[in-house]
Amino acid sequence: MPQHRTTDVVVIGGGQAGLAAGYHLRRAGLDFVILDADTAPGGAWQHTWDSLHLFSPAAYSSLPGRLMPPQPGETYPDAAHVVAYLTDYEQRYDLPVHRPVRVSGVHRDGERLRVETTSGTWRARAVISATGTWSRPFIPAIPGRTGFQGTQLHTVEYARPSDFAGRKVIVVGGGNSAAQIAADLAYESDLTWVTLREPRYLADDIDGRALFDHATARRKALDEGRTDTSGVASLGDIVAVPPVRTARDTGLLKPQPMFTRLTATGVEWPDGTTADADTIIWCTGFRPALSHLAPLGLRGPRGRIPTAGTRALAEPRLHLLGYGDWTGPASATLIGVGRPARDAARAIAELLR
């Protein structure tokens, strides 16, 4: 028989944002559960490519209440270290995570919100959606894409360069993921890196610490009614982590302009130039994973739900956490999600009094 349960708050998503929410809900004295679709702790970090490293030291990659310990021999921790940290965090605070549980929909149900899942129904006084973006990869509608006879992957499906040894690979995208995957492939594959505009590297001495400090300063300026035009964000898009820096400086990363269409065997540029490809890897970003909130009818422009901070404007019982700057500055990062998680927990505690 399906189960029907009641709680103060349902948190949807057991990655870094969901755990940060759980930490602050516990401190606020609220009854809550965290519903996670994955079978194990670690969120999206357990699904990344093998060589992925953070671009901040461990101390600048921590959730509230517990510093991430350094990884021996590494300035910037790898994804496996992050998974171990999140697993420990969840256990240390005895967070009530239920998994694997997939949420199919959130509905208004009188004074509560009804959360329908694969393991039954929860009725909650408030909901925090923290499902992130990793489960909703975006690939642009490029002419000819369905007719390409090679292999097409998104960032989420890339694992290691040895899978593409000796093959002609085109990497599409101008952000950190594209640069890191291109650098990963540059030594074993016949690589072409394609970007919409010329890649902009941040200075080599800038890492995630500076980016977080800038995001914090930007939020303070906005809160005070000022326009923040300073900081590192205007200087580049790509953090020059050591593998990217090495590949760039040795001439292995030579970006090409964006092509206009795919052919059966590769790609074609506006001047008629073509290039063959065995594989195209789309490092073209993600969209918020919000389909479970569709029954509430809240979606606005660009697929987002209009918010004030983390609170949905049209449904004060719903908070959105960790989807990007529109749900809090740097809220999609380990260190940045703590403050909006705290704000969401406080707002919910006030609402439920």
Please provide the spans of the model-predicted regions:
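Flavin (primarily FAD) cofactor-binding/catalytic cores of flavoenzymes
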Residues: 2-38, 42-44, 77-353
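Redox-cofactor-proximal catalytic regions of oxidoreductases
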Residues: 40-67
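A short acidic, helix-capping loop that chelates divalent metal ions and anchors anionic groups
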Residues: 69-73
